[in-house]
From Swiss-Prot:
Entries under InterPro entries matching the protein: FabA_FabZ, FabZ, HotDog_dom_sf
Any GO molecular function: (3R)-hydroxyacyl-[acyl-carrier-protein] dehydratase activity
Database matches in SUPFAM superfamilies: Thioesterase/thiol ester dehydrase-isomerase (SSF54637)
Enzyme kind, highest EC tier: lyase
Compartments, as annotated in UniProt: Cytoplasm
Transmembrane segments: none
Origin species: Lactococcus lactis subsp. lactis (strain IL1403)
UniProtKB keywords: Cytoplasm, Lipid A biosynthesis, Lipid biosynthesis, Lipid metabolism, Lyase
Name by which UniProt lists this protein: 3-hydroxyacyl-[acyl-carrier-protein] dehydratase FabZ
Amino acid sequence: MTKKYAMTATEVMEVIPNRYPIMFIDYVDEISENKIVATKNVTINEEVFNGHFPGNPTFPGVLILESLAQAGSILILKKEEFQGKMAYIGGIDKAKFRQKVTPGDVMKLEFEITKFRGKVGTADAAAYVDGKKVTTCQFTFIVDEAAEQTN
């Protein structure tokens, strides 16, 4: 039986700590050494649409960036040397938003590592809807120890 996705949502949750309502990866389409393509299905049921914006629901740009960062975290934390660690955003540069994302859109999230030295790296990222680029940016990321969980 052929596997439909490179990683399901359940498998994603084994790698990154994000959970509802701040979990933005539905599945991973492709993953290689330095690049990932993941999918976020934007639905009207997202909490954010209660206030952003009534009558004109628009997925916030900052959450598109967070979605891209989560895809990047999966890519980074799947590397053997970083399993069990945390990936953090160190910076976001050259963010551009080309069109709005609305309920019903399917975002394809691409994150490609361009440089990695020690625990710090950079990446180019882009989000697409219907094959059109909606957002681009460059990330600086830092990998560090995971914080202790307290309940």
